[in-house]
Amino acid sequence: MSALNKYSGAYQNNKYSPRGQPHRSRSMNAFRYDAQQIKEQARLIRRNVITLNAASPAGGHTGADLSETDILATLYFRILDTGPERIEDPERDIYIQSKGHGVGGLYCCLAQAGYIPEAWLADYQHFNSRLPGHPVRQKTPGIELNTGALGHGLPVAVGLALAARMSGSNKRIYVLTGDGELAEGSNWEAAMAAAKYGLDNLFVIVDKNKLQLAGLTAEIMPLDPLDVKWAAFGFAVSECDGNDVEQLVSTLEQMQTRKGAPQVLIAHTIKGKGVSFIEARPEWHHRVPKGDEVSAALEELNHGE
């Protein structure tokens, strides 16, 4: 048994999928959870997001962590052809967290899925921690790319998708960007290249929570009509409620069946989703819960649907 299989979380030391088959064919996720199971994982991830950020000595990005939670849970517990025992498998799907400031949510997801021990979450952003404030693949199992400087994830994802195509690999490359991040021109240069090479193994997900550090994205650097922009750059465009697991599952699985062009999902989310006093509040971009806020947030997240 590998060391990774001993970690706590939903993985539960099982190297096989719920269908009882080893991971050899296309579209084999380690869990293949249904929507209700994914929602429960998202709830548990959100609880850890609150405690992780509250204990951080260097702040955090609570709002961004919470807006992306349903997307991450859907990817890791249903969509990605990978699992915690396959982090060195050359045929695994690759997930890149381009919005690196939201890594707290990703760490909580990785812990829940068994990639890292849940005990590590208490060391988030502490000195010499294995969980730094932005993704570092040399420190954290399951992290595929060092990010944080916005606009870098998609260009690298395009390169990985092209390399996979040239080598005959069936792997898919997924990348999550923020909507504010799309003001970076490097994203659009990469998008042009993805369309030129017809990279239908590339899946971009935009966490469109409409807020960034300084306020409303629509006021700082308007993006809309975002669907028209992506289509003009040669992408097949999908949209859904990015905090609705049923919609995420349906849309992402439908996207996997399309061929001939790179894909983008515009996921309409609420920054801070799941905690009423954090939702849609720009000040929570770089705020963490303290004192009574922690218990109040956890109380709201005590029960699933």
Residue ranges and their predicted role:
Residues 245-305:
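Glycine/aspartate-rich loop-and-adjacent alpha/beta segment that forms the canonical ThDP
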Residues 70, 101-102, 209-210, 244, ...:
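Glycine-rich beta-alpha junction loops
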Residues 56, 66-196:
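Cofactor-binding active-site loop characterized by glycine-rich and histidine/acidic residues
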Residues 1-27:
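N-terminal amphipathic/basic-hydrophobic helices that include classical n-h-c signal peptides
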Residues 23-45:
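N-terminal hydrophobic or amphipathic helices/low-complexity stretches enriched
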Residues 93-95, 171-175, 202, 261-269:
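Generic beta-sheet signal
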Residues 142, 146-149, 154-257:
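Thiamine diphosphate
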Residues 41-59, 207-209:
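N-terminal capping segment at the start of a domain
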